[in-house]
A protein has these predicted regions:
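Conserved glycine-rich Rossmann-like NAD(P)H-binding loop of the short-chain dehydrogenase/reductase
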Residues: 28-44
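Catalytic loop of short-chain dehydrogenase/reductase
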Residues: 91-113, 132-188, 196-211
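C-terminal helical subdomain
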Residues: 211-249, 254-264, 268, 272-275
Length: 283
């Protein structure tokens, strides 16, 4: 288990699973950077943690903007120096039925692909330096059992769109990225894993879809903590978990050609935000 006085960044930590994970990490003695878009909601989580004897700080960024993702990472690097855990939890679900309303991000990408995949991929890459300084360190990507291959010729889903399909594609991409990054960081002291925490937890994301919840947030927290601070997350890397158990992601996420093509497209989209900008964000 990770020791006290280490720092974790949890994205999407103002509600649902992310909020509960932030509290659990603080309860284990970690300093938690509570990410959100809304200052009041983030402050509420920080207040809740500090009143319970934990240490936390709010950090704000809209993950639909890759520039804001870069600024968040640059601030963490400059202000914290070293961190030991990144939990890429923030995400957008399928939406409300009939799931037909497509939205684009600030950068013109399909919104779920941007927030659920491009943002965590960029954040993880830009935080490699402080994670190496904090090693042994971990990256935990919150995925889903719902995964579908990405149509690289139609990333914005101009030809056919449903929120559910967009969500599944984003989680496919995140799993494939997890495996790629784990290979790249082998031997660095950073483990990278992905998990489906629990099926249809009682969260706003699930309730919005009008599907009855099937499991509790507490069940999901237990699975996340297994990889975030427990034994599994420190001994394996490049793996996919379904709850507490190692499992197999979509077969396509293991295909070398598929991953190579996705990696190339992702690199092209993220390259402008991976270059050093000379700017530091203030939080």
């Amino acid at each position: 288990m990770m020791t006290a006085a280490t720092t974790a960044l949890v994205t999407g930590a103002t509600a649902g699973l992310g909020r509960a994970v932030a509290g659990a990490l603080a309860g284990q003695g970690m300093r938690v950077l509570v990410h959100g878009r809304d200052a009041k909601r983030a402050a509420s989580v920080v207040d809740e943690i500090t009143k319970s004897g934990g240490a936390a700080r709010a950090v704000l960024a809209d993950l639909a903007s890759l520039q804001q993702v870069r600024e968040l990472a640059d601030w963490v690097n400059a202000d914290q120096g070293a961190i030991t855990l990144l939990v890429n939890n923030a995400g957008i679900g399928a939406g409300r039925p009939p799931y037909r309303k497509r939205q684009l991000s600030a950068d013109g990408h399909e919104l779920r692909f941007a927030v659920n995949y491009l943002a965590p991929a960029l954040l993880a890459r830009r935080l490699v330096p402080p994670l190496k300084k904090g090693a042994p360190a971990r990256i935990v990507n919150i995925g889903s059992v719902g995964q579908a291959p990405v149509d690289l010729a139609d990333l914005r889903m101009d030809n056919h769109y449903t929120g559910a399909e967009a969500y599944y594609r984003s989680k496919f991409a995140l799993a494939a990225f997890t495996f790629d990054l784990a290979e790249e960081l082998a031997g660095s002291g950073i483990t990278v894993n992905c998990l489906h925490p629990a099926s249809l937890m009682n969260t706003h994301m699930v309730r919005e879809s009008l599907i009855p919840p099937m499991s509790s947030v507490a069940t999901g927290v237990k699975a996340v903590m297994n990889l975030a601070t427990g034994p599994d997350g420190g001994t394996v890397t490049g793996r996919y978990f379904d709850g507490m158990n190692e499992a197999r992601a979509h077969p396509g996420t293991y295909d070398p050609v598929t991953r190579s093509r996705l990696r190339a497209v992702t690199a092209e989209l993220l390259d402008p935000f991976l270059r050093d900008s000379g700017r530091q964000a203030s939080r």
